[in-house]
Amino acid sequence: MIDGEFGGNQDWFTNIVMNIGGCGAATACDSCIYLAKYKGMKELYPFDLEQMDKEAYKKFSQLMKPYIRPRVQGVKKPEWYIGRLEKYISDVNKRCGTDYQIHMEKFDGTGDADEAERIICGQIDKELPVPYLMLRHLNTEKYKDFIWHWFLVVGYEKEKHETWIDVA
């Protein structure tokens, strides 16, 4: 929790570029905070894990910005996100003498829904959040805040023949 919120929010960013297009960096920040707090990879978040607040989160986002920087059309390719987050982790390893290894693999929109559900639910069942880029959705009105947007999938719910994701 960051000042009562689950995860960060790019609306907090005072840097205009990050405020408009920093969802990829915010998702990476949230991922690193989760891994630091719950998976023992404490050096991935260089601030106090017990006293997280918006100011520290904004500072962290500025550290992440050179790795996953906003672009004119956003961080529109998952491999960009993966490669740059791997670079951040590699730099943390070099700087802190750690050896964090995180296997990240792209699953894109060409796969089928059943496979996506299996992958996402499998990661959540392992207590690992899933960075997710939604470029389009058939229901543009209902999901307008998620179109062309990175976010973190942190849970799911199954009801009969449907699975719903919980996001941060």
Where do the PLM segments sit?
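Active-site-adjacent structural segments surrounding the nucleophilic cysteine of cysteine proteases
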Residues: 1-84
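Conserved active-site-adjacent core of cysteine acyl-enzyme catalytic domains
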Residues: 58-168
